[in-house]
Amino acid sequence: MTSDDVSAIEVTDGVRSLHLEWDDPGIAVLGMIQLTRDELVERIRTGELPLPPLAKLLNIEVVDAAPGRMTLRLTPDERHVNFLGVVGGGVVGAVLDVAMWGAVQLSVQDKSMLTTVSMTSNLVRGVSHTQRALEAVAEAVHVGRTTATAESRLVDAAGKVYATATATFVRMGGGNG
């Protein structure tokens, strides 16, 4: 997915609108079940396997993916703003969560899927909707038979940290790793 996939925000009489389109999320689930880990990594990295609809809504795209790590790009805009006029902490948390999930999911050799059961995030500085793209860089810390953990950080192009997070994931069927 690229930022070209998301239509520009349109303004008519001061009202903003955004048209979104996404692929059937079942395609990605089916791909995860049918592909080897290496095939899954490659198809996510190239954009051949669609990200979930949440990625379109939040304007997230894959920068890089490999077993044990994932980097996503968030391009903030007005859709992300809270009542204080800055990008909401929930948006930041969601991007970090998706990146950490990718890092641990791409680490498993079997067909099990992982889901987040606990996440802690720390917002270090505010994110403006007018700033340039930020990257959520995540790494798997532990991938075991039943649980996995990961850590991530949201950084700008200069490496300045905006947020950090850690998460625990649990396996849901498919094997014992």
Residue map of PLM features:
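Terminal targeting signals and extreme-terminal segments of soluble enzymes
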Residues: 1-177
